[in-house]
Every structure is written in structure tokens, then in C-alpha cells.
Swiss-Prot record:
Name of the molecule in the record: Nucleotide-binding protein Mlg_2233
Alphabetically ordered keywords of this record: ATP-binding, GTP-binding, Nucleotide-binding
SUPFAM superfamilies tied to this protein: P-loop containing nucleoside triphosphate hydrolases (SSF52540)
GO-annotated molecular function: ATP binding; GTP binding
Binding site for GTP: 63-66
Role this protein plays: Displays ATPase and GTPase activities.
Recorded family membership: Belongs to the RapZ-like family.
Stored InterPro entries: P-loop_NTPase, RapZ-like, RapZ-like_N, RapZ_C
Upper lineage: Bacteria, Pseudomonadati, Pseudomonadota, Gammaproteobacteria, Chromatiales
Organism annotation: Alkalilimnicola ehrlichii (strain ATCC BAA-1101 / DSM 17681 / MLHE-1)
């Protein structure tokens, strides 16, 4: 049986779609950018009919410049791909409006949906509405608001470059003062734990540093919360696999995203690393 993997990459302009597509191309994927939605089914059938016996990996970029009626057909087209027996997935990238406006201002590029005197914010809002059907069917969404080009490349490789039979499990730390990650499946609050920030010698360090780790290891409630989160995730991962979910993102937050959440994310990733899943860790605020 052929092992064919087809990923549809879409998202808001300025969020990193081209970076994601080029990253997969560098990894040996056959990539097509800006494919009209009306040709997606025909391309999938062609791949299914002509792909070598050993299978292949294909990525297709789709954006909002398609006709609105074609974008509305996305759910039906994705169902058709599943009926063909293809291992198809949708990756959707997005960023906050403020971030997108800043990126377009810095690059001085024109938004693809800008027409005449329309404000950039209006073009972004229109694009969000047009791509809503595709985002609703996404297997994986990535918020790139706080991610640079190099970090996005690493993130795409970590989340996509794995055996399709394995679940990609990401543990992400964050700071509540900077907002909850909108792409998380689970969110856990670690602000109830003792805060190393109030120890002057630990304040400039992070949860990756041994002194902070030793401080948190000595707190019984830290071990208790870590164990409870581990038990909950371990209990429900089989249900995600049964539902054919390929990606799960677990976010752990503290006030600033420097100490407690970083430590817990590392601890949880280590506890699940010996299993069958593809494990990755990301510390959002440490990348700022």
C-alpha cells in the first residue's frame, strides 16, 4: 500500500506560509504554491494514481486569492481527499492583527487583498473571514506572532517531520502577561506554585537553569501539579489517537513565562519522551 502524505498549507498573509512551504521543500517534499482550490482534487487524484509504490510527500499552498465560492467548498474537497484514502492534513498559520500590520509596514509589501484605499486592517479582517472554513478544518494551527523566521522553520520541522503514524505532542511554556496561546489544545495554570522570581538570586535565571530547577524540585506542590497534568494527558492521549488526531499542543503558563512554566514544560516533555509520540518543547517567552 502506498504511503502518501499530503499537507495543505494555508493561513493569513504575513504569517509565514511561504516559510513553512520552503522549509518542507528543503526537507524533500514536493511543493506547489498558490494552487487554485478548484485544482486540488485533480492534483490529489494525480498523486494517488502516479505516486511511486514507496509513496511520497506533497505540500500545497492555498491562500485567500481563490474565489469565495471555492473557499466555501473546502470542507467537501477535504472529505473527497479522505475518500481517496490519502493521508491529508491542513496546516494553518496565523498571527495577531497587530503583528501582521507591523510586518507589512516593515517590509512595505502590499497585502494581496488590498484594493485601492482599503485599510490594511480591513484587508486582514476580510482575509480572516474568507479563510475561516479552511481554518475550521485545520489539523494543526500555528500562532507565529512571537516567532521569527528561524524559529518558524524549526517549529515546522518539529511538528511536521515525523512518522504520520505517530502523534506530535508539543509542550509549550508561556507567560499570562503576554496572553494565552490561541493554538493550544490544553492550557494549565502554574501561577499557583511558589515563584522563583521573588528569590533575588533566581530572578535573572530561567526554568532551564539548575538553581531554579533545584528550587522548584524542593516544593511538594510542584511535583504534585506536574504529576496530575501528566496523568490527565496520559489518560486522554489514546482518545486523540483513536480520533486520528495528529497534533496536540499542551500549554503551561505562569506570570512571565520564565521560571515555573518553563520547568514544568521540560519535565512533562521528559516524562513522555520514552513513549511512541513525537515530543517537542517550545518556550514562547524565552524566544522574545
Amino acid at each position: 500500500m502506498k504511503s502518501i502524505r499530503l499537507i495543505i498549507i494555508s493561513g493569513l498573509s504575513g504569517s509565514g506560509k511561504s516559510v513553512a512551504l520552503h522549509t518542507l521543500e528543503d526537507q524533500g517534499w514536493y511543493c506547489i504554491d498558490n494552487l487554485p482550490i478548484g485544482l486540488l482534487s485533480a492534483f490529489a487524484r494525480h498523486v494517488n494514481d502516479t505516486c511511486p509504490a514507496g509513496g511520497g510527500r506533497y505540500a500545497v499552498g492555498i491562500d485567500a486569492r481563490n474565489r469565495p465560492e471555492d473557499l466555501d467548498r473546502i470542507p467537501a474537497i477535504l472529505d473527497e481527499l479522505q475518500a481517496l484514502g490519502l493521508n491529508s492534513e491542513v496546516l494553518f498559520l496565523f498571527a495577531s492583527r497587530e503583528t501582521l500590520i507591523t510586518r507589512f509596514s516593515e517590509t512595505r509589501r502590499r497585502h494581496p487583498l488590498s484594493d485601492g484605499d482599503a485599510a490594511l486592517a480591513d484587508a486582514i479582517a476580510r482575509e480572516e473571514a474568507l479563510l475561516a472554513p479552511l481554518r475550521a478544518r485545520a489539523d494543526l494551527t500555528l500562532d507565529t506572532s512571537n516567532t521569527n523566521v528561524h524559529q518558524l522553520r524549526d517549529l515546522v520541522r518539529e511538528r511536521i517531520e515525523h512518522d504520520p503514524g505517530r502523534l506530535s505532542l508539543l509542550f509549550q511554556s508561556f507567560g499570562y502577561k503576554h496572553g494565552i496561546p490561541p493554538d493550544a489544545d490544553y492550557v494549565f495554570d502554574a501561577r499557583c506554585l511558589p515563584n522563583p522570581h521573588w528569590e533575588p538570586r533566581l530572578r535573572p535565571l530561567t526554568g532551564l537553569d539548575a538553581p531554579v530547577q533545584h528550587y522548584l524540585e524542593a516544593q511538594p506542590e510542584v511535583a504534585e501539579l506536574t504529576g496530575q497534568i501528566e496523568a490527565l494527558i496520559a489518560t486522554w492521549l489514546p482518545a486523540f489517537r483513536k480520533a486520528a488526531r495528529s497534533y496536540v499542543t499542551v500549554a503551561i503558563g505562569c506570570t512571565g513565562g520564565q521560571h515555573r512554566s518553563v520547568y514544568l514544560a521540560e519535565q512533562l516533555a521528559g516524562r513522555f519522551a520514552t513513549g511512541m509520540d513525537a515530543i517537542s518543547v517550545r518556550h514562547r517567552e524565552l524566544n522574545r
